[in-house]
Amino acid sequence: MIMCGITAIFNIHDGAQALRKQALLMSKRIRHRGPDWSGIYQGKTAILAHERLSIVDPASGGQPLVSPDGKLILCVNGEIYNHQELRERLKGDYEFQTGSDCEVILALYKKKGIDFIEDLNGIFAFALYDEEKEVYLIARDPIGVIPLYIGYDDEGHLMVSSELKGLEGFATHYEPFLPGHYFYSEDRKLTRWYTRDWMDYANVKDNPTDVQQLHDALEAAVKRQLMSDVPYGVLLSGGLDSSITSAIAKKYAAKRIETNGKADAWWPQLHSFAIGLKDAPDLIAARKVADAIGTVHHEIHYTIQEGLDALRDVIYHIETYDVTTVRASTPMYLLARVIRSMGIKMVLSGEGADEVFGGYLYFHKAPNAQAFHEETLRKLSKLYLYDCLRANKSLCAWGVEGRVPFLDKEFLDVAMRLNPVAKMCPGTTIEKKILREAFSDSLPKEIAWRQKEQFSDGVGYGWIDTLKKITSESVTDEEMANAAKRFPINPPQNKEEYYYRSIFEEHFPSESAARSVPSIPSVACSTAEALAWDSAFKNMNEPSGRAIKGVHESACLLYTSDA
């Protein structure tokens, strides 16, 4: 298992030595993602480079990985959670060289060609080069938990990089590589490999709802994702999602899941981490959860000034000017530095639950089950531009890997096939009620039924309020009036966005960089389509959960009496 950074250059016909130097420069720009080791392969028509953060098989799992016959070369950023099952199935067809979970990709390609990606349960972005056939395959995981960008230069070279900074200045044009897709050089196009029946409302509208099945599926996902040969922890904000993943992780932390619980864990004490301004809502709630489940808890305080001082570095690392993402990434970036300083290289996080279960406060306004379900689909399809990007890049800035059980491939098939009616939260019904019911026995009552806080809200309301004030004072009315002239691509809609965009442009001045960031009107993280749910939404453009008047202020503990 390797969380890392990858870069590659394909379609090389001459000048390979000069391109090797370029590949090394590209790779160096993303070395923060993998500070443990660097590797590079140069072939006839391809160069693949890798920056390694070792999590599983630290001694022999370096990359690029090479097949026993030397003809297949692979760079992977990711985790293959079902690799042991795949190894068992493939051991008669392939001679494994390492203990890396990612080597199963080579074995699968050798046996099945390009038609193997569906066999993988994991999070990944990879580039595979077939030296004998002089073809290559690039692919990305279903939801886009792992970042990847693809680009071209004027000489016709195709390039990929885990972060856009690896392509900025080298590729004439680049863009995010779409999740759930692959690019095969013989086809010369992106092809969607990840499709599901639950992507059509007609296939789920009459489904039953099994709370126990939901419980068991998430527990299995968390357990799967605990495989590690290095110390790990959990991000514990005190919200519902991180509290559930932390409670499940604690249940299994004492034993190594690689041995099916037969051997003691190498680091049996589970460490949990929370960050916020002093007395922030998240910190208070996280303490309660940590005490209840028995983690070794670490509470990190940051000041508003420390957050402001970090903004320029945060935007460089997360590669976006999206307001919500910048707000939430800053405390996570500061926390990741502390986590790494304590020797922790992997953490579980709660991203994805709000998209799967309609946990954002605006979902209260969904007019019917079909609209609700289709909005969850839209939210899932855009996660790679928002929360997945934030979680991955904020943590990887300091060489920490993040895993997200709520976006586990097998769990998604259970959760997204639930009857959407069971997920809805009409009127005063609390959001994610079915998830709360599934795990109400695992958490303190006041946590199981605590209302949704966005991460940037929960770390302390003063953080957002100060950001608005500082950015408003820093950007003049004249600058804002001329925003569309200075930034013709995705013009900023408010002064806070203008401020972040200016910093982003200093780091990444190209048009490709500007186009890589989404810019749509939003209320409390809604998609543009959901603005039609309430006429009041059309007059707002505030991504914070506090935009939903009357919902945030009410302490929504409506079910504590009978939970």
What are these model-predicted stretches?
Residues 1-6, 341-348, 367, 372-561:
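Adenosyl-5′-phosphate
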Residues 2-321:
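Cysteine-centered catalytic environments shared across enzyme families
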Residues 19, 82, 98-101, 120, ...:
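Hydrophobic (often cysteine-bearing) scaffold residues that line and stabilize catalytic clefts
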Residues 30, 225, 253, 257, ...:
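A generic secondary-structure signal for well-formed alpha-helical elements
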Residues 106-107, 243-247, 336-337, 358, ...:
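Short, hydrophobic alpha-helix immediately C-terminal to the catalytic nucleophile
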Residues 127, 323-335, 377-380, 476-480:
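Short, basic, helix/turn surface patches
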Residues 211, 275-336, 362-371, 393-394, ...:
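ATP-dependent adenylate-handling ligase core
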Residues 344-354, 360:
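Short acidic/histidine-rich active-site segments
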